[in-house]
Amino acid sequence: MGNGNSALLGTDLDKFEKIRLKRGGKKCYRLKHLCWCKGELDRFGLSDKLLETQQGCEKILSVCWPLYDQGSDNLKALVGTVCVVACIHAGIEIKSTQDALKKLKVITRKEEKQEDESKNFPVQRDAAGQYQYTPISPRIIQTWVKTVEEKKWKPEVIPLFSALTEGAISHDLNIMLNAVGDHQGAMQVLKDVINEQAAEWDLTHPQQQPAQPGGGLRTPSGSDIAGTTSTVEEQLAWMNMQQNAINVGTIYKSWIILGMNRLVKSHCPISITDVRQGPKEAFKDYVDRFYNVMRAEQASGEVKMWMQQHLLIENANPECKQILRSLGKGATLEEMLEACQGVGGPQHKARLMAEMMRTVVGQSQNFVQQRGPQRGPVRQPTGRKPICFNCNKEGHVARFFKAPRRKGCWNCGAMDHQKAQCPKPAQQQRVNFLGYGPWGPSKPGNYPAQEVTPTAPPLEEKPLQKTLSTYQKLGRGLRQKMKEEKREEDFHSLSTLFQEDQ
């Protein structure tokens, strides 16, 4: 195979022979490598003429590139050679085979990304400036149906629906709603909301009667926006008018999201006022539950801000509430989470105990300093000394007596009983109930020496109390009299049973 049949000629062939086989190596490409490449293409059923153009090299790579990672050494060498030839056709400067592989990988990834973006948006503009409609991808529909089956109607379903239907028209939105097989009750609620919004649209945007002259577009009605009485071409025309364009897809999407908000509210029976932190619940988990329920609340931003500033603090447990109140009103959520981190754990309880002990010790020290030193001599106890029941001596007790323990009764000395069962009176005088104290055997000084006569005048008796006491006395007299009469009757009745002695 001569030079006339080569895929590269002239300066391109000179560039090809300057590129190294490996990065940092000494060997470069030669004409024999192109001949070997054409022979390998025959094995794949590809024409060797594809190497003569850049588009032909891209077709070769589209066939061989998916097999590159799991392919043999010959396949990897073929892909590397084709990449080098493609870079020379495209005018990309490279020095080795690895550089060619990297350059083409970057270009391939950019093209795939552009294709993915074009699939996600149904309405696209071509090179001539005309709008073209691409049906919604089945992958998006599958993602939406799977999310509804798993999440039901939780608050996070609404942002996902909004992201999946970016730039969609009413026809695509109806396809998304009709793909939901279950939850037909929720779908009926959604239809009712759409009908209400369509009726309100018809009242605020009356249609022109008769239609616009010259065969122009009519003003869309509520049913046209919902996609029931309009075609795909009409929806595209309304969205892309030069003047006064009406984006029917965005309007219909806002109606659907309004109905979804009502579904989320009905499927979330917990009110935001009922979300309270448990005694052992972490503050982070409580915040997650609080904001999850708050997403389902249909309220304005000001109301939700008030909920965050007041309800989040008031519904916390006492420990977190005390910490949050100490932060002040202007505390952010990040500061709250950082302050309440670890509340309820052993470290937090130990820290609270240490603070309480430090406070108590400080208060006692302040009290001693304020009281000052004690004035006057220290008062010593003057009571009698304790008596040992083992040796009958004063000054110590039997527990600390070193002599052997005395047996028998400690009161009379008998061996057949103990002191507690001794029938003889105690030889020593017993201690009073106040025990030994500084007052000695006599009564303490706080006992009054004699009864003090009150100097205040006696309380006046109220008439009602006086009458009540009088009736009580009369009642007691009547009860006593009735008891005596019963006794006399019993006596007379008993006398009738016996005859008089004859």
From Swiss-Prot:
Instruction: Indicate which residues form the motif PTAP/PSAP motif.
Output: 454-457
Statement: the UniProt record of this protein carries the keyword Phosphoprotein: yes
In which residues does the motif Nuclear export signal occur? 16-22
Under InterPro entries, the record lists:
Gag_p24_C, Lentvrl_matrix_N, Matrix_HIV/RSV_N, Primate_lentivir_Gag_pol-like, Retrov_capsid_C, Retrov_capsid_N, Retrovr_matrix, Znf_CCHC
Known post-translational modifications?
Capsid protein p24 is phosphorylated.
Q: Where is the signal peptide?
A: none
Cited Pfam families? Gag_p17, Gag_p24, Gag_p24_C, zf-CCHC
Question: What superkingdom heads the lineage?
Answer: Viruses
> Mind listing the GO molecular function terms for this protein?
RNA binding; structural molecule activity; zinc ion binding
Task: Spell out the residue ranges making up region: Disordered.
Answer: 204-226, 442-502
Q: Place the motif Nuclear localization signal on the sequence.
A: 26-32
The entry's keywords: Capsid protein, Host cell membrane, Host cytoplasm, Host membrane, Host nucleus, Host-virus interaction, Lipoprotein, Membrane, Metal-binding, Myristate, Phosphoprotein, Repeat, RNA-binding, Viral budding, Viral budding via the host ESCRT complexes, Viral nucleoprotein, Viral release from host cell, Virion, Zinc, Zinc-finger
Q: Report biased composition (Polar residues) as residue ranges.
A: 493-502
Site Cleavage: list residues. 367-368, 432-433
Lipid anchor (N-myristoyl glycine) at which residues?
2
Record's compositionally biased regions (Basic and acidic residues) = 481-492
Q: What is known of its domains?
A: Late-budding domains (L domains) are short sequence motifs essential for viral particle budding. They recruit proteins of the host ESCRT machinery (Endosomal Sorting Complex Required for Transport) or ESCRT-associated proteins. p6-gag contains one L domain: a PTAP/PSAP motif, which interacts with the UEV domain of TSG101.
- Per the similarity annotation, which family is this? Belongs to the primate lentivirus group gag polyprotein family.
**Protein role:** Matrix protein p17 targets Gag and Gag-Pol polyproteins to the plasma membrane via a multipartite membrane binding signal, that includes its myristoylated N-terminus. Also mediates nuclear localization of the preintegration complex. Implicated in the release from host cell mediated by Vpu.
Please report the name of this protein according to its UniProt entry.
Gag polyprotein
Q: Quote the gene name from the UniProt entry.
A: gag
